[in-house]
């Protein structure tokens, strides 16, 4: 059983704060259309409400597609203990927000809806990016292209980046020796 979140099919969730643009990080992204103050609810992350089991199934299908040379991006967000939101729908421009190791926004569940919130003031023209928070287990499968000074080269949650740096340093020492 699934249901739609607040935006209607075929209509993007309106946001006066962002515009879609080509991204230096990956494909398309969202940029600030005007200055965004810290704490602003920038845009709602919308899509199909699905069970955890269905979310797991879709994730496996999309990861298999990536292995077959297709997009394979996963746009599933945790909503609560029973349901997730699959944002892989055309009316969800928030799905275009790329990962950044130096995030300027973050997702937050507020009254059963997922909002992207500004962590700091964001300048007009600046690309939005949040920490995807991937676990360390499959870190090699998620190279990071954000290019920030704090980026270890792979998408992992902030608390695990030091581990990736240590693993890479050990590999570099082994290769040099």
Q: Where do the language-model regions lie?
A:
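Catalytic cores of histone-lysine modification enzymes
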Residues: 10-108
């Amino acid at each position: 059983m699934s249901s739609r979140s607040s935006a209607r099919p075929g209509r993007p969730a309106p946001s006066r704060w962002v515009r879609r643009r080509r991204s230096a990080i990956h494909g398309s992204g969202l940029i600030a259309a005007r200055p965004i103050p810290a704490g602003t609810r920038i845009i709602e992350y919308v899509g199909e409400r699905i069970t955890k089991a269905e979310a797991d199934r879709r994730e496996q299908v999309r990861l298999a597609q990536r292995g077959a040379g297709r997009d394979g991006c996963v746009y599933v967000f945790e909503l609560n203990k029973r349901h997730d939101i699959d944002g892989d729908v055309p009316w969800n421009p928030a799905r275009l927000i790329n990962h950044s190791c130096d995030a300027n926004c973050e997702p937050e569940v507020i009254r059963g809806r997922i909002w992207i919130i500004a962590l700091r003031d964001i300048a007009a023209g600046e690309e939005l990016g949040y920490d995807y928070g991937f676990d360390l287990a499959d870190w090699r499968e998620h190279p990071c292209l954000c290019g920030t000074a704090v980026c270890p080269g792979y998408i992992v949650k902030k608390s695990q980046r030091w581990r990736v740096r240590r693993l890479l340093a050990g590999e570099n020492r082994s290769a040099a020796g």
